[in-house]
């Protein structure tokens, strides 16, 4: 029997890096609400009560980025030093400039072209309903549930910062059981750790992970140091784009290296990543293969991909040449086509910033639809 263990992690929206992703995407959405052709690349850094926002923007929109940032931080749940960030004492530095004209002349044409060179990957597997690796799906579900029990006071004494991790045992390539679960939950100084562990097992872990995946030897680690009373930006510096594996496939497949948050869809890092996932997911949903990874590469100022690579990890049920042919016929992989077909010039990005850009079923996540599977099936023959 071929047996191995794979681990994935996720974080709550209160994790310092995710706070920054949320701020970046909230700012992006505000620009897109007023001007759908906005060119935006905004990043930020948060530490203690300091927030630095920087980037390049070309837009007719007028956005109060400081106001957007503070509102986002409040929505997450930060308010005081003890919670991790005191919005009343925040120091905000901004440095936002216009997009380089050298870049703009390659992007702003009759048809939108790539705003930079780069390679991206999309991945899909049929091992879960979301077509995500199961460990990644479970990690996101745990982090989302951890946030829910805090916001709804199902578990008292929690603050926004938190993390989850799932180690999953595979047998002959199929998920078998959970080896371990890790939760980190930022809490009030007065919170009893034994009570917290009991509550999180009952209200988070047992609500998310099916009992069929739990074994007697499954280990659970909650705030493993014994205390997590100092958290959020008060404990750790946060930075936009530092959770790219959490954002994607939890360590399965490959990553082109480019982060998503704060970038408008003319940036191939974002739009082409969404398209590569869309392609991979539809190929798996059409039952052409059990697993699929799609690489797309682009050149700045060019409309169409420089290269397309499809890896089915030996699970293909049709000749790979046929799969390539069908992919090219069904999907418009030009940057302009991606933006139009996935309707990416809308203010939809704040929702993507936490709990993964993939495996979601909200209407905004057009790249998660499997609406091309029937066309693929008809063409494959």
What do the predicted segments below correspond to?
Residues 1-41, 46, 380:
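N-terminal, positively charged regions that mediate nucleic acid binding
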Residues 7, 67, 74-230, 354, ...:
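Glycine-rich, mobile lid/loop segments that gate access to catalytic sites or pores
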Residues 9-11, 15-20, 112-127, 229-253, ...:
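Conserved phosphate/anionic-ligand binding catalytic regions in large, soluble enzymes, centered on
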Residues 13-32, 128-144, 263-287:
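Alpha-helical support elements that line or immediately flank enzyme active sites
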Residues 38-42, 162-168, 218-222, 288-299:
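A short glycine-rich, hydrophobically flanked beta-strand micro-motif that places a catalytic Asp/Glu
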Residues 41-59, 300-304:
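Short, charge-patterned binding micro-sites
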Residues 47-48, 289-291, 299-381:
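Internal helix-turn-beta structural module
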Residues 191-283:
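Glycine-rich anion/phosphate-binding loop at the beta-strand->alpha-helix junction
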């Amino acid at each position: 029997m071929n047996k191995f263990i794979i681990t994935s992690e996720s974080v709550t929206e209160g994790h310092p890096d995710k706070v920054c992703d949320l701020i970046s995407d909230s700012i992006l959405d505000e620009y897109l609400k007023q001007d759908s052709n906005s060119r935006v690349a905004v990043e930020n850094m948060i530490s203690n009560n300091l927030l630095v926002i920087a980037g390049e923007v070309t837009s007719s929109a007028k956005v109060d980025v400081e106001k957007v940032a503070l509102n986002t931080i409040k929505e997450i749940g930060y308010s005081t030093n003890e919670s991790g960030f005191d919005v009343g004492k925040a120091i905000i530095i901004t440095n936002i400039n216009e997009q380089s004209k050298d870049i703009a002349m390659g992007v702003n044409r009759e048809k939108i072209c790539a705003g930079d060179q780069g390679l991206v990957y999309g991945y899909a597997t049929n091992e879960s309903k979301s077509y995500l690796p199961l460990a990644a799906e479970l990690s996101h579900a745990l982090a989302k549930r951890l946030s829910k029990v805090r916001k709804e006071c199902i578990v008292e004494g929690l603050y926004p910062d938190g993390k989850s991790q799932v180690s999953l045992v595979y047998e002959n390539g199929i998920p078998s059981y959970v080896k371990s679960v890790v939760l980190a939950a930022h809490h009030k100084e007065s919170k009893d750790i034994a009570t917290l562990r009991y509550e999180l097992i009952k209200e988070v872990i047992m609500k998310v992970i099916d009992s069929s995946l739990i074994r007697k030897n499954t280990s659970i680690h909650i705030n493993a140091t014994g205390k997590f009373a100092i958290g959020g930006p008060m404990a750790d510096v946060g930075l936009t784009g530092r959770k790219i594996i959490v954002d994607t496939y939890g360590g399965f497949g490959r990553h082109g290296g480019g982060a998503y948050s704060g970038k408008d869809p003319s940036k191939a890092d974002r739009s082409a990543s969404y398209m590569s996932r869309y392609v991979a997911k539809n190929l798996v949903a059409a039952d052409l293969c059990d697993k699929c990874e799609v690489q797309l590469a682009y050149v700045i100022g060019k409309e169409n991909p420089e290269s397309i690579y499809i890896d089915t990890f030996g699970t293909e049920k049709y000749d790979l040449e046929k799969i390539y042919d069908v992919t090219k016929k069904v999907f418009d992989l030009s940057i302009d086509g991606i933006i139009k077909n996935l309707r990416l010039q809308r203010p939809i990005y704040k929702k993507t910033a936490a709990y993964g850009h993939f495996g979601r079923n909200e209407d905004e996540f057009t790249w998660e639809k499997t609406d091309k599977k029937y066309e693929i099936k008809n063409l494959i023959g």
